Amino acid sequence: MSKRDYYDVLGVSKGASADEIKKAYRGKAKELHPDRNKDNPDAESLFKEVNEAYEVLKDAEKKAAYDRFGHAAFEGGMGGGQRPGGGFGSGDFSSAFSDVFEDLFGDFMGGQRGGGGRRAARGSDLRYNLRVTLEEAFSGLQKTINVPTAVACSSCEGTGAEGGVEPTTCPTCSGMGKVRAQQGFFTVERTCPTCSGLGQIIKNPCKSCRGQGRVEKDRALSVNIPAGVETGTRIRLAGEGEAGMRGGPPGDLYIFVEVAKHELFERDGVNLYCRVPVSMAKAALGGAIEVPTIDGGRGRVQVPAGSQSGRQMRLRSKGMPALRGGGIGDMFIELAVETPVNLTSKQKDLLREFDELSEDNNPETKSFFSSVKSFWDGMKG
């Protein structure tokens, strides 16, 4: 059977750039990989064809020879005998995709990447949920928290080895933490089964930590909570997470702040809102009222005569501080005109008398019922 054109195999034009060829190869190799096409009997042969095409087209010399002579460039010579670029069969087949292998198949290998020797395992990052009051969020505070975590073992100083004996290099992976295995036409890199990827083995594990180099323990940490935090604020404490395995670097601690609801104030960014009840008389006649402020003080505002429920007044710079500077928000007072209850007979008589005398003092009521009358008249007509 005649071979397909290599450009057609990868789905690129003859003038495609090296990056375009590489991108096309990645897509085809991922699409046709046998592990993803176990029900397709042709997957393996198609996968090999893709790798064969990429082996040629990724190499400038081989590509030039292929562009000039086609497949004949790699089939025993062109009448004179020498293969340009050494020919396809002259090298290790796995080199065809060594530069993109990890990007393509990292998901099959658990996302691990090889090379560079062993790296001590970094400790995990930790999350701590911290609930604070609105007053604490306003002023900021220093707070001590207890965090359950893994700390370096004091018995072995984090090495995991008993009696100060140093770990030895793993003989299976030579300290790389990974081993390679040939699978068909390509090389697969996996975590070393002997040392679990650490590159070292311990002949006499520490009894306190069982060779892990760390133990479980609660840590007391002093945390600075800045003024202006709000629900969702995240504070990072570098190096305060779990200790790494066998001397590896520690992870980080992330504190997620939740600001508790307040019985008097509602918060919207840097502004505060306080709903203040006022009597009918105060709303009608006007006058000064005192309101609480988040700093524990008192604010004084003037209620205009004739105020209705929902009217807002502002106290400037009595809100919350901005987290990263930039001033302080305002406090808004919303009036809630309260209707009196549990009236005495005398109070009821006075209100009836007042109602009879106040027909011209309720413009909204008068306007509403005038509109209602017009609506009903229109329905009749």
Curated annotation (Swiss-Prot):
GO BP terms: chaperone cofactor-dependent protein refolding; DNA replication; protein refolding; response to heat
A Pfam family hit: DnaJ_CXXCXGXG
All residue ranges annotated as the J domain in the record: 5-70
One GO MF term: heat shock protein binding
Family under the similarity heading: Belongs to the DnaJ family.
InterPro entries per record: DnaJ, DnaJ_C, DnaJ_domain, DnaJ_domain_CS, HSP40/DnaJ_pept-bd, HSP_DnaJ_Cys-rich_dom, HSP_DnaJ_Cys-rich_dom_sf, J_dom_sf
Name of the protein this chain belongs to: Chaperone protein DnaJ
Residue positions binding Zn(2+) 2: C170, C173, C192, C195
Quaternary state and interactors: Homodimer.
Superkingdom as given in the UniProt entry: Bacteria
HAMAP family per record: DnaJ (MF_01152)
Cofactor: Zn(2+)
UniProt key word NADP: no
Known function: Participates actively in the response to hyperosmotic and heat shock by preventing the aggregation of stress-denatured proteins and by disaggregating proteins, also in an autonomous, DnaK-independent fashion. Unfolded proteins bind initially to DnaJ; upon interaction with the DnaJ-bound protein, DnaK hydrolyzes its bound ATP, resulting in the formation of a stable complex. GrpE releases ADP from DnaK; ATP binding to DnaK triggers the release of the substrate protein, thus completing the reaction cycle.
Sequence ranges of the CXXCXGXG motif repeats: 153-160, 170-177, 192-199, 206-213
Binding annotation for Zn(2+) 1: C153, C156, C206, C209
Gene3D superfamilies associated with the record: DnaJ domain, Heat shock protein DnaJ, cysteine-rich domain, Urease metallochaperone UreE, N-terminal domain
ZnF segments: CR-type: 140-218
Cofactor stoichiometry and binding remark: Binds 2 Zn(2+) ions per monomer.
